[in-house]
Amino acid sequence: MIAKKIKPFAIAPADVGCRNHILGAFRAIGELNGQKLNPDNLFVLPDGSQSFLEVRTALVYTGFKSYREFTEKLFDLLDEYLAHKKQIPQVFITVYNPTESHEPGRNADVLCRAVKEYYKIRNLGKVMTVVLSSRYYKYRYVDLINIPKHLMTFSLRIRLIRNKNLRKKVLITMGTIHNFTMQAVVDKCDDLQAIMKKYEKDADLASIISKLDNFKHKEKKVVFCLGGRVEGSEIVFDINYVQKLYSDAEKLVASGYGVVFVNGPRTPSTVTDYLYEKALKNDNIVFQNCKRIAQIKEDYAPSAWRIYSGPHEEEFRKLQKLGNIYPGVLGFGNTLAVHTMDSYSSCETASAKIPTAVSCRGLYIDPAIRYDCRNLAQLLCPKYAIDFDEFVSMACNMKIEPKDLRPRLLSNPLRVFAETVVKRLNQLG
């Protein structure tokens, strides 16, 4: 099969990181096609959302009582989705997501099994199944398994070498497949500046826009990109850790830096409150909430921790007019992107040639369960990124700036991924 005929699709995930992995895969296939694929047409929406950007509830096998109940839901979604398609997609893509349950491998494999069964029952021909950012797992229904290096251990490498059938399906990459580019940063930076100009006299936004304008004109800058907790207890992302980060931010401010904090869906609401309240008192530190804000009763349940609920809901709703300032704030020049060790986003900025740091100290991560986090930090530092504590010391004592770091560019695996998809699809016939 030639690349131009390939059409991929996916079930839209609720997790932003997973969505970005899938968008990267779509972009890779589109670029090999020589065309820009519209993601609005490639995502199956699992929860009645109007856009893949608005999905709140993921389709997860372990969340159903039985396989039959799961397939009934999936088949209904696929029937509705494919009823409007002129071309039946041949490639189904999903992501190994350890943040949504303790059985991410099983969830991905069963989803791929169900998709293959749907194609067989509906006489749609063969479908190739792909799982991104996976750990080692004995998949039965996945045709292409992307395993980033940081998700492997020595013992898992040995197991993979010994499993010839599984090994044939594996594509190992340095870093993750993602949708982050420097051009996107530039475009988002232009959008951010246009919004700042539009709302500079807005009563709700004037204060934060003034602080962002101050940040923009600083000669050196730092943007903290926060990760957060997961469903289990293996990552402890708490106030103690964030107090340490904020203290480091104050040291950098004292050395002439402008600082921005942006949270994410996994950032605890208590941490969000702490940073917002602290930043209000410092003209050189900006905090912008990027979590969804509670709207309905279900959003206040403990299980809805990815949605912000707390004392600052009204303030954050007013600030929504500004939009998500990340990654636009990375585009002002001489800026360091600081990622917490629990996040894979460090791969994104490192591959876009943005000076990147990884914050490890003070963040507890169970090494037996989430060895991938430490592995990624060790793979990136010091070749492609810098340890954040080292940077703080160098910035404060030696006047080192982000532009002085000059890290090596982390290669983006998009093309090799797309070429592998074409090759495997041809092998499947």
Mark where each language-model region is.
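Catalytic donor nucleotide-activated moiety binding site of glycosyltransferases and closely related
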Residues: A254-K318
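A nucleotide-sugar donor-handling region in carbohydrate enzymes
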Residues: R140-D238
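Leloir-type glycosyltransferase catalytic cores
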Residues: A194-D204, R374-G429
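Conserved catalytic-core segment of nucleotide-activated headgroup transferases in glycan assembly
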Residues: V222-C225, R229-T270
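Structural motif
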Residues: K7, P89-I93, M128, L144, ...
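A donor-sugar binding/catalytic signature common to diverse glycosyltransferases
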Residues: D15, K318-Y371
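Active-site and donor-binding regions of nucleotide-sugar-utilizing enzymes
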Residues: F9-I172, H178-F180, Y300
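Short acidic-hydrophobic, aromatic-tinged amphipathic segments that line or gate anion-handling sites
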Residues: L171-M174, I285-Q295, R306-E314, K321, ...
